[in-house]
Amino acid sequence: MKSLVLLLCFAQLWGCQSAPQGTGLGFRELACDDPEAEQVALLAVDYLNNHLLQGFKQVLNQIDKVKVWSRRPFGVVYEMEVDTLETTCHALDPTPLANCSVRQLTEHAVEGDCDFHILKQDGQFRVMHTQCHSTPDSAEDVRKLCPRCPLLTPFNDTNVVHTVNTALAAFNTQNNGTYFKLVEISRAQNVPLPVSTLVEFVIAATDCTAKEVTDPAKCNLLAEKQHGFCKANLMHNLGGEEVSVACKLFQTQPQPANANAVGPVPTANAALPADPPASVVVGPVVVPRGLSDHRTYHDLRHAFSPVASVESASGETLHSPKVGQPGAAGPVSPMCPGRIRHFKI
């Protein structure tokens, strides 16, 4: 009898520790494809994207689990597990998420797994807790789907570093205004055929002009950060190398006082020989935030900076999606996990 009492006590203690802080012990399970669950999940992903510091924006792929806890004295707390997928839009890109393409499996996709606790009280949502991590698709799965598709390559790979330096030098060469520095290597792949290296990276405007830079270390980033996102390809030909780079500037870049009156255009392309002119100074590749750059992707575990809370009026940040009503006949769908919106990794 004493053993049974002790067992019940331990069960109650475990339940108290598992429940989100401030809730009662009672909860209800909500179907993962319920419009209510989808609305809260979209809000959670929106919160995630608003606080990403590096890497790429995320899109909701699947809701794995939902519990709705009663909160004393008022409100409810949604405890959710969701899967996300990386998009092609960088975290700093102001492009609306709806206009961002999902990174496809053939591009070596990366999946995010997130746990959220979201309070709903008086029609207001507040994110109380967030914990995420990322996992790329396995090389084996990519090879099965597309044997010749390039895989993710470490940021500190020799070809990657060389391509980023060369591409940034090419961009600064054809730019008559602000000198840009590297902020982050976002993605890299070595392509076997034709032999080339693909890179995506973030740049930022400095207080120097591109034509007058002699020591990049003396160029400081502007107080109000002005970022751009670049994609580059370095072809390894028999007769040498050729780089092509295209950069999208997220805002109109202010020019230093002694700069040319004509500033850089929002999108710039360059196709130049790999070796920059002697007058062009290439700064070293930056290793951001002290993380080892044998990484091949930006893990949400490090890229996401959680904030204590973010309040959002229910209907201001997102709208409930149109969810089809179930037919009169047919098998009953399981409550969870929910539907896969794109593809499963």
From Swiss-Prot:
It is found in: Secreted. Residues 312-334 are annotated as: Disordered. Its main location: secreted. The modification Phosphoserine is found at S134, S138, S305, S309, S312, S314. Phosphorylated by FAM20C in the extracellular medium. Liver is the major site of synthesis, but fetuin is also expressed in limb buds and other extrahepatic tissues during development. InterPro entries: Cystatin_dom, Cystatin_Fetuin_A, Cystatin_sf, Kininogen_Fetuin_HRG, Prot_inh_fetuin_CS. GO terms for biological process: acute-phase response; negative regulation of bone mineralization; ossification; positive regulation of phagocytosis; regulation of inflammatory response. Glycans are attached at N99, N156, N176. Pfam families: Cystatin. Keywords: Disulfide bond, Glycoprotein, Phosphoprotein, Repeat, Secreted, Signal. It comes from the Eukaryota. Residues 1-18 form the signal peptide. Belongs to the fetuin family. Human AHSG interacts with Plasmodium berghei TRAP (via integrin-like A-domain); the interaction promotes sporozoite invasion of hepatocytes and formation of exoerythrocytic forms of parasites in human hepatoma HepG2 cells. Probably involved in differentiation. (Microbial infection) Facilitates invasion of hepatocytes by Plasmodium berghei sporozoites. This is Alpha-2-HS-glycoprotein. It comes from Mus musculus.
